C-alpha cells in the first residue's frame, strides 16, 4: 500500500497491490518455508518493489509475521527478498503485529462501550486483543497470538466439503485456546453484560459481510465498517463449509484464490464468537498495513 499524507492523521492511498502467496504452506508439518511458497512471495514482492521505485516512495516499512517467525529458514527467506528485490523486511513480534492491526482499525470501534475485542486472522496466526477504552483512545490490556491461521487450518480441513464434525472440532479447539485470556480478565462476564464491542479484520470477515449483503462481487466501500450478527456468521459459515471448492470459487466474494481457505477462516471467526458471543461484529477491511502507514506518518 502506497499512500500520501493528507491534513492531520489522514492519508490518501495512491497505489496498492495484494496477492495471496500462502507463504506458510506446509510449515506446520515441516517447520520450514517451502521453496515454492518462497518463490510465490518473491514474485509478489517484486511487483511491490517495482511500484515503490516507480512512485519514488520517501518512507518505507515492510514487515514479516508468523510464517517467518516460526520457520527455521525464515532468515534465509528475508535475505532472498533483499537480494532479489532490494526490500528490507523486518520480522515483528506478535505484540507489535497486534498493535499495528489495532491502530489500523480502531476508528471503527465507535459504539461507546468500555471494553473491546479485536481480532486479526492471518495466514499463519490469529491475534486476539482485549481492549479498554480510555480518554485518548483504545488501550491494549492483553492479547494472545494463536499459532493458527487460515493456511494451517485449511490444510487440516481440506479443500472440499467439510464434515460437520471436523468443522465443529476446529471451532471448539479455537474457543478452548482463548480460555486463558478469558479467565485472566473475566471477559465473558463483560460480554454477557453488554459492555464489549468486537471488531474483526481479515479476509474472512469481509467475505462473510459481502455474502450477507448479497454482493455479486466484493465492494470494499460497502463492506468496510459494516456489521455482522452472529446468526449471519453461523449461517454463511455453514453454507461455505457445505459447498465444494468449485461452489465457493464461483462466488464473487470468495473466488478461486481463497476457496480452499475461507472455511478455515470461518472456523476461526466462529471459535472467537463461541467464546464471546457478542450481539454483532464490526467488519474492517483495514488493519496492519494501515497501522504501519499511520506510524510512518507520525515519524520516528
Predicted segments — roles?
Residues 9-25:
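N-terminal glycine-rich anion-binding loops that anchor highly charged ligand groups
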Residues 2-4, 129-132:
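Short beta-strand-to-turn element immediately C-terminal to the catalytic PLP-Schiff-base lysine
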Residues 115-125, 129:
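A generic, well-ordered mixed alpha/beta core segment in the N-terminal half of proteins
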Residues 59:
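Cationic, histidine-enriched alpha-helical/coil surfaces that engage anionic ligands
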Residues 22, 26-55, 67-115, 132-133, ...:
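Helical "lid/coupling" subdomains associated with nucleotide-phosphate turnover
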